[in-house]
Swiss-Prot record:
Taxonomic source organism: Prochlorococcus marinus (strain NATL1A)
CC terms in the record's Gene Ontology section: cytosol
Name listed for the protein in its UniProt record: SsrA-binding protein
Annotated Basic residues bias: 1-10
Region (Disordered): 1-21
Length: 165
């Protein structure tokens, strides 16, 4: 069979070919991200199918380190449509994140010393693997958010003015 008539579908892909499945856009607004880390996820089969279908919400998610393991809490993955109640997963199940021991220790030290938090930023495919980008961040105050909005608005106005001329 020839591939002459086939066209590739357009998807959310970044420069290096990874397909973005979900993104936590609110996290960059509410937190000042100091460091990022790519981790794997320990998932069930129905969770993988739901994530690939884009039925995941990272908005309220956060990570904790317990017993030298990173755990992902409060991330909603909708149940898979074609699986029965017995075989389906729990939507708010706590998921284990896969990272190297040294990376976990580094995160643990920074969380204890500086009072930071770990937030899920984006969920994407890397090859056939589902990866989660987490960020170590410090919460922003309301006035910091307002200042950030003013800076972004002024940059946008300057860019629009330059575009007209």
């Amino acid at each position: 069979m020839s591939k002459k008539g086939k066209k590739k579908s357009k998807n959310n892909s970044s420069v290096d070919g990874n397909r973005r499945l979900a993104e936590n856009r609110q996290a960059r607004y509410e937190y000042e991200i100091l460091e990022t880390l790519e981790t794997g996820l320990e998932l069930l089969g129905t969770e993988v199918k739901s994530i690939r279908a884009g039925k995941v919400n990272l908005k309220d998610g956060f990570c904790l380190i317990k017993k030298d393991q990173i755990q992902l809490h409060n991330v909603h993955i909708s149940p898979h449509n074609h699986a029965g109640k017995f075989f389906n997963h729990e939507p708010l199940r706590i998921k284990r994140l896969l990272a190297h021991r040294k990376e976990i220790e580094k995160l643990k030290i920074s969380l204890e010393r500086k009072g930071l938090t770990i937030i899920p930023l984006s969920l994407y495919l890397k090859g056939s693997w589902i990866k989660l980008k987490i960020g170590v961040g410090k919460g922003r105050k309301t006035h910091d958010k307002r200042d950030r909005e003013k800076i972004n608005d002024s940059k946008r106005d300057v860019a629009n003015a330059l575009k007209r001329f």
